[in-house]
Amino acid sequence: MTTIYVVDAFTTKPNTGNRAGVVLDADHLTTQEMQDIAAFAGYSETAFVLSPKDQSHDIHVRYFTPTHEVPICGHATIATHFLRATTGHQSDYPLIAKTGAGHLPVSIFGSSKELLVKMTQGRVEFLSPFNESQRTELASALGVSESDFADLPIQVVTTGHSKVMVPMLSRNKLDELI
């Protein structure tokens, strides 16, 4: 039987923050089984903890959305190491976590009541800003006007898992997108 833990990252209050699924012992699972579990769990990402395959890392973590595997997930990484530290599955920090985005250092600070998990992400990379045609297409896809965008570049930024950064003029317009 596989246990899926539900962990709220970036918060000290239950049922707030950014929720992730975490499976602490995934060595027996196939890639398809991990994908099926992530789809069943339904969280934006579910992390699967695997034993290290060599001495280049202390832990191997794979991340799945309900539809596909992704190289890294910040909040699921924080959730995974918080859970491991508070359930006795890991006490030796810092450590090196192998992910699809590379080998990342993870540290734990504080006491059991107020743990702080620190992960060092990969080097940030900024891709070319969107051109006018791409900005128009994005505004249409989001259901907003181009005038809702701040006068800053819209571009893909990555530290291992690419995201489109869309600066909005208004917090209200941003909230309407959710």
Predicted regions and their residues:
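Active-site proximal loop and beta-alpha junction motif in alpha/beta enzyme cores
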Residues: 1-72, 78-178
